[in-house]
Regions:
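N-terminal leader segment of winged-helix/HTH proteins
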Residues: 1-39
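Active-site phosphate/pyrophosphate-handling residues
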Residues: 12, 46, 122
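Short, solvent-exposed coil/turn segments
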Residues: 10, 43, 92-94
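DNA-binding alpha-helical recognition surfaces that contact promoter or target DNA
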Residues: 74
Length: 124
């Protein structure tokens, strides 16, 4: 049966939330890239927002991000190659590694924070 009114496909809350999130992500990535951080993806940003300033265990990052440990390790490998994180021994358990920000990673987090603030202001 042919539809006479297909407007419902884009005139609903779910579509509008998706479109707003898509724009938010694009704005955030554009700001980060303009800040000198080329090669940063939304997946990497989702990793970074789950790392504490003092460092975080891989299993904790995975739980916070809702990702598998294997996926998080792949993201950490990419972030390490970009020079924004490093792995080091956990001071509380030498058998465990934690992921910490490098000075470049700290600057990226500051840039990300400013990008998020700017994107939120544009939406307000």
């Amino acid at each position: 049966v042919p539809e006479t009114n297909a407007a419902w496909r884009k005139q609903n809350l779910g579509y509008r939330l998706f479109a707003a999130n898509d724009r938010f992500v694009r704005d955030k990535l554009a700001s980060v890239n303009e800040g000198g951080f080329a090669g940063i993806t939304d997946a990497l940003l989702s990793l970074l927002i789950n790392i504490d300033g003092v460092g975080t265990r891989v299993t904790d990052i995975a739980a916070r991000a809702g990702l598998t440990k294997q996926s998080v390790v792949e993201l950490i490998d990419r972030a390490e190659k970009l020079g924004v994180v490093r792995r080091e021994a956990d001071p509380d358990d030498k058998r465990t590694r934690i992921v910490c920000f490098t000075p470049l990673g700290t600057r990226l987090c500051h840039c990300l924070q400013q990008a998020i603030i700017g994107a939120e202001q544009r939406f307000a």
